[in-house]
C-alpha cells in the first residue's frame, strides 16, 4: 500500500516518541538531516527539484524542551511558533493546519502533524474536505499514525522503540511502499533526542 508521507506517535517504556517517513513516487531523491539538536529537515539531493515543487523541502521535526513537533511540511515552524507564544498545543496544531490548509498540488495533498509532550500526544490532519485534531493520553506500547493517502483516519500500529534512531529505522522499515527517508524524536528525561535514517547505504 502506498500511503505517502506519514507521522506517528508512540510510547515505549514510559517514554513518548514521534516518527516521520517520506514515501514518494514523484521525488524520491531526498534525505533527512539533523540540524543541531532541535531540528530535522527533509532536503532534496538535487536543488533543481525545488523548482518543480515548493513542498519537498522543510523542517519535518522541531523540538522544544518538553515538546516535539513532527509534520510533513512548513507548518512545523508555524506550530512551534504558536506553542512558543503560549497557545495550548491543541490550538496551535488546529490553527496552524487551518491557516496553511492542504497542499495546493495536483493531488490536494493533506497536511499532517503529530505533537508529543509529557504524557500526552496529538495528531492532526487538514484535507480538502475538513480538519481533524485529536488528543491521545498515551498508554505504554501504544502507537498511532496518520498519512497523506489511504490512511487519512487516525489508526493504530504495532511499533515500539528505545531511541530516536530506532524510531527512524522502524518508520523506514514499515511495509508501506516507496520509502525514501525517515526521522524520529524520542523523550529522554526532560528533553527529546533526534534520529534519522536514509535507507541502506
From Swiss-Prot:
One annotated GO molecular function is: IMP cyclohydrolase activity
Pathway per its UniProt entry is:
Purine metabolism; IMP biosynthesis via de novo pathway; IMP from 5-formamido-1-(5-phospho-D-ribosyl)imidazole-4-carboxamide: step 1/1
| Taxonomy, superkingdom | Archaea
| Keywords, sorted A to Z | Hydrolase, Purine biosynthesis
Q: What EC number(s) does the entry state?
A: 3.5.4.10
Q: Which reaction does it catalyse?
A: IMP + H2O = 5-formamido-1-(5-phospho-D-ribosyl)imidazole-4-carboxamide
Q: Which residue ranges does UniProt annotate as crossing the membrane?
A: none
Kindly list the biological process annotations in GO that this record carries. 'de novo' IMP biosynthetic process
Family annotation (Gene3D superfamilies):
Inosine monophosphate cyclohydrolase-like
Keyword set includes Hydrolase: yes
Which enzyme class, named as a word? hydrolase
Instruction: Give the record's family classification.
Output: Belongs to the archaeal IMP cyclohydrolase family.
Q: What does this protein do?
A: Catalyzes the cyclization of 5-formylamidoimidazole-4-carboxamide ribonucleotide to IMP.
Protein name stated in the entry? IMP cyclohydrolase
Amino acid at each position: 500500500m502506498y500511503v505517502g508521507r506519514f507521522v506517528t506517535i508512540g510510547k515505549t517504556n514510559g517514554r513518548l516518541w514521534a516518527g516521520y517517513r517520506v514515501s514518494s513516487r514523484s521525488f524520491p531523491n531526498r534525505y533527512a538531516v539533523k540540524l543541531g539538536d532541535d531540528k530535522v529537515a527533509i532536503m532534496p539531493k538535487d536543488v533543481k527539484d525545488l523548482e518543480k515543487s515548493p513542498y519537498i523541502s522543510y523542517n519535518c521535526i522541531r523540538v522544544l524542551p518538553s515538546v516535539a513537533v513532527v509534520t510533513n511540511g512548513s507548518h512545523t515552524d508555524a506550530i512551534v511558533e504558536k506553542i512558543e507564544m503560549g497557545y495550548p498545543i491543541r490550538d496551535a496544531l488546529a490553527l496552524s493546519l487551518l491557516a496553511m490548509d492542504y497542499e495546493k498540488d495536483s493531488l490536494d495533498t493533506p497536511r499532517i502533524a503529530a505533537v508529543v509532550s509529557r504524557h500526552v500526544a496529538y495528531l492532526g490532519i487538514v484535507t480538502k474536505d475538513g480538519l481533524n485534531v485529536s488528543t491521545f493520553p498515551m498508554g505504554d506500547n501504544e502507537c498511532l499514525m496518520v498519512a497523506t493517502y489511504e490512511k487519512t483516519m487516525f489508526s493504530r500500529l504495532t511499533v515500539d522503540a528505545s531511541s530516536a534512531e530506532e524510531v527512524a529505522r522502524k518508520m523506514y522499515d514499515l511495509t508501506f511502499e516507496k520509502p525514501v527517508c525517515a526521522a524520529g524524536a524520542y523523550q529522554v528525561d526532560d528533553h527529546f533526542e533526534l534520529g534519522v535514517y536514509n535507507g541502506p547505504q
